């Protein structure tokens, strides 16, 4: 997962916790400068949370598909959490609350805030934990994939070296074949030359024998 996304994530979780506390504090205050200041702080914090959500969204969409899916799933939980904070802020900052209903609003707001926030953050924590586990599995799968890729590359390199060795041996054998062919041609030429010489010698011998016979016959006749 992206370190940038995790940085935004930590900032948002801290900000969300602080905003939840401030909403609870503001809900028990009477109308006055203190409450107005608290509401202004909450409004500023919610704006900051909106910015962090947008940054996380942009960062998540720039990641690889496997990491992108995990980050977008987390982001949905954070958006849901922020929407709940906005509802609490709207209820706390409502200027239309009547004095007669302020006690009821404060009690119901506090109860709802505690119940919803606890439930929301419980589900959020569980979702984040599951997503972290998924991230760990994805990282482990990626590590195994990289190791497998390295082994594959090593095998390909070994096969390439073996191929080069075989090609070199083939070239040597081809050279030996050429030498053998040349030797055969030389031996064939020598054999033909020897055969031709043999016929020449035989012809000379026959001619000499005939000459000797003729000479002897001539002498005997005279």
Curated annotation (Swiss-Prot):
Membrane topology term: Single-pass type IV membrane protein
Cytoplasmic topological domain: 2-199
For the Vesicular compartment, the record's topological domain ranges are 221-222
Q: Which UniProt keywords apply?
A: Acetylation, Cell membrane, Coiled coil, Golgi apparatus, Membrane, Protein transport, Transmembrane, Transmembrane helix, Transport
Which residues get modified to N-acetylserine? 2
- Which sequence ranges form a coiled-coil region, renumbered to this chain? 68-95
One MF annotation (Gene Ontology) recorded for this entry: SNAP receptor activity
Report the Pfam families cross-referenced here. V-SNARE (PF05008), V-SNARE_C (PF12352)
A GO CC term assigned to this protein in UniProt: endosome
Q: Where are the transmembrane segments?
A: 200-220
By its UniProt entry, which InterPro entries does this protein fall under? GOSR2/Membrin/Bos1, SNARE, v-SNARE_N_sf, Vesicle_trsprt_v-SNARE_N
Keyword Hydrolase belongs to the record: no
BP GO terms, sorted: intracellular transport; protein storage vacuole organization; protein targeting to vacuole; vesicle fusion
Q: Between which residues do disulfide bridges form?
A: none
Chief location of this protein within or outside the cell: Golgi
Subcellular localization is given as: Golgi apparatus, trans-Golgi network membrane; Prevacuolar compartment membrane; Cell membrane
Q: What is the effect of changing residue 129 to K?
A: In zip1; dominant suppressor of the zip1 mutation (plants lacking VTI11) by changing both the specificity of SNARE complex formation and its intracellular localization
Knockout consequences: Altered transport of storage proteins to the protein storage vacuole (PSV).
Where is it expressed, tissue-wise?
Expressed in roots, stems, flowers and leaves.
Summarize subunit and interaction data from the UniProt record for this chain.
Forms SNARE complexes with the t-SNAREs SYP61 and either SYP41 or SYP42, and with a much lower affinity with SYP51 in the TGN. Also interacts with VPS45, a Sec1 protein, but not with SYP21 or SYP22. Binds to EPSIN2. Core constituent of the SNARE complex required for membrane fusion at the trans-Golgi network. Interacts with SCYL2B.
The UniProt function text for this chain reads:
Together with either SYP41 or SYP61, required for membrane fusion; the fusion of phospholipid vesicles containing SYP41 or SYP61 and VTI12 is triggered by YKT61 and YKT62. Functions as a v-SNARE responsible for the docking or fusion of transport vesicles within the trans-Golgi network (TGN) and mediates liposome fusion. Necessary to deliver proteins to the protein storage vacuole (PSV). May be also involved in retrograde traffic to the cis-Golgi.
**Which family is this sequence assigned to?**
Belongs to the VTI1 family.
Q: What is this protein called?
A: Vesicle transport v-SNARE 12
Organism name = Arabidopsis thaliana (Mouse-ear cress)
């Amino acid at each position: 997962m992206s370190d940038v996304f995790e940085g935004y994530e930590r900032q948002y979780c801290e900000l969300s916790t602080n905003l939840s506390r401030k909403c609870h504090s503001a809900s028990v205050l009477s109308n006055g400068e203190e409450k107005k200041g608290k509401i202004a702080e909450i409004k500023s914090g919610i704006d900051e949370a909106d910015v962090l959500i947008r940054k996380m969204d942009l960062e998540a969409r720039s990641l690889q598909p496997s990491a992108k899916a995990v980050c977008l799933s987390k982001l949905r939980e954070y958006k849901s959490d922020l929407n709940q904070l906005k509802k609490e802020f709207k209820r706390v900052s409502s200027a239309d609350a009547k004095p007669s209903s302020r006690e009821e609003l404060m009690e119901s707001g506090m109860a709802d805030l505690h119940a919803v926030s606890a439930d929301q953050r419980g589900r959020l924590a569980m979702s984040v934990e599951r997503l972290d586990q998924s991230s760990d599995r994805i990282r482990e799968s990626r590590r195994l994939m990289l190791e497998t890729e390295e082994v594959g590359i090593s095998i390909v390199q070994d096969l390439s070296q073996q191929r080069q060795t075989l090609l070199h041996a083939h070239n040597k054998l081809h050279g030996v074949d050429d030498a053998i062919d040349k030797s055969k041609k030389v031996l064939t030429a020598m054999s033909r030359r020897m055969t031709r010489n043999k016929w020449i010698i035989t012809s000379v011998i026959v001619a000499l024998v005939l000459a000797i016979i003729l000479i002897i016959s001539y002498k005997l006749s005279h």
